[in-house]
């Protein structure tokens, strides 16, 4: 049995699913980073496959899902990010309207089944696209545990957030509020880890204080080191389909300070602090409040992720979704 695995960028969560599926089946990759593809080449790949598995409803999944439908082959589509979002106040999400809305809705409606990474994302695709609830299976992300037992002792007063730096993420990922909060808590070191994609880094430097460090792009090992080092992880987002970086940080023992946007409450549970909105003063106060958290609270953060989002749950969910379609 062969799966055609379709994606636009080979990011960490895509790689995880790819490897989990390869444990059981033959998987061929189809990567399309841009808008335009050769339909005949896509058609050849779909003909060879028994099932199409795609990540997000966008330009790269339009032809594979469409051809699968025409050839009466089953397809699975993972949704729950820009493709299902409608957040006009920050200009985010395909469901705001126009060509991208029509493209995403066409693709979503023609997939045989949908996978959402959170209950929030399931509700969002049902609400914004109008698909039936029973078409959507919730399969939470599985977070690989690369950290092991937490070391004893206090951590540095470091508040961490992880995001590519771009104009859209200034508001969506709460980067503006993060660096502004740093000015209100000068005794804390604020660290923004992520590649600079445009000149929005200049605005953040103007807004932030001297206690903000901008690392730029880092290796996986360097990112893991920051997770181990930080006391607090801040996710001041306006929309999150899951919040994988929060889960990774908690697995490393960071205490989360998050907004109630999207699936973030679903991820953190009763650990850390939840804020109604990305207010810099509230973020600064929350960071101060959890800085002194001891080993017991860090262990709770780690156990929350180990219990609810292990890799085995993702593996079982993907296998069940594929086998259901194959009959």
Language model feature labels by segment:
Residues 238:
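Aromatic "clamp/platform" in nucleotide-sugar-dependent glycosyltransferases that forms part
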Residues 46, 217-218, 225-230:
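Short alpha-helical donor nucleotide-sugar binding micro-motif in glycosyltransferases
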Residues 201-224:
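Nucleotide-activated donor-binding/catalytic signature segment of Leloir-type glycosyltransferases, i.e.
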Residues 95-114:
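Membrane-proximal helix-turn-helix segments that form the acceptor-binding/catalytic region
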Residues 151-185, 191:
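Conserved donor-binding/catalytic core segment of Leloir-type glycosyltransferases
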Residues 109-135, 145:
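A short, active-site helix/loop in glycosyltransferases that binds the activated sugar's phosphate group
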Residues 255-258:
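Short hydrophobic beta-strand element within catalytic cores of glycosyltransferases
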Residues 272-280, 289-294:
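Conserved acidic donor-binding segment of nucleotide-sugar-dependent glycosyltransferases
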